Amino acid sequence: MISHGKDIKIFTGNANPALAQEICKLIGIKLGEAEVKSFADGEASVSLYESVRGSDVFLINSTCKPVNDSLMELLIMIDACKRASAGRVTAVIPYFGYARQDRKAKSRDPISAKLVANMLTASGADRVLTMDLHASHIQGFFDIPVDNLLGNPVFVDYYAKKFGEKCENMAVVSPDVGSVARARTFAQKLHMSLAIVDKRRQKANQCEVMNVIGDVAGKDCILFDDMIDTAGSICNAAKAIVEVGGANSVYACASHGVLSGPALERLSSSVIKEVALLNTIPETMGAGCDKIKYLSVAPMFAEAIERIYQEISIAKLFN
């Protein structure tokens, strides 16, 4: 690593320490010494066991389950670093929770993503580094720099090696209209055709698949989305691709494996052959489902952190 006069320090909370360790190993530094624990009543407590004065500090903590605990850990870590005279604090949030609450869907709804942005800024964060925000316009909720890395290259590399020349006879399928832009870019990179599943959502976390737009008959398909929560949408989409569209087989991939409630059971019993997830959320969340394969985003975050530290553009990571 090239130094430019100030130390780099990386700390992690309890949300995804394995990813933080992997990032530090790639950069070639030790993970900072800190303790993030809870008092008997559940309050988060942070202790930094090394100086951060004047340092370029990166705090790694996905705001995943337990979501509110993970968020409070991050906020308190930021505050601790600022009060200890850190030169700059970057909140590294591989999975940004509350991103689905980015607008008022009905009367009197909160815009929780904006609230979280305000909280991160108020706590003292100087910039945010994240990946595949559920809604990219959330970057505009902040008054500080936000770098939203894309997981697309990781999946493109994986499937290009997995399927090789077969890619030209495969299809990428968006599970809904909202994911079409992501799926289109993914399909173009792999030289695959594009299809869309049209669905009608009945209530939260449930949906009814209606139709498949595009030709998937006889093809091996990849369902592409930004996250899998309860897995209802992805499993119903896969079923429609096979039963309605006549696809030969279905694979699935998503940047964030939230995997709540019945997700693992649904994926295990679905027609999906394999589910590729990024490790923005701990791999332990997928334990118990043999179909799940995790791909590491540590190299991408490590390079982004090094570039931010060295004051070099990270535009390369978006191309």
Spans of model-derived segments:
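PRPP-associated nucleotide enzymes
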Residues: 1-319
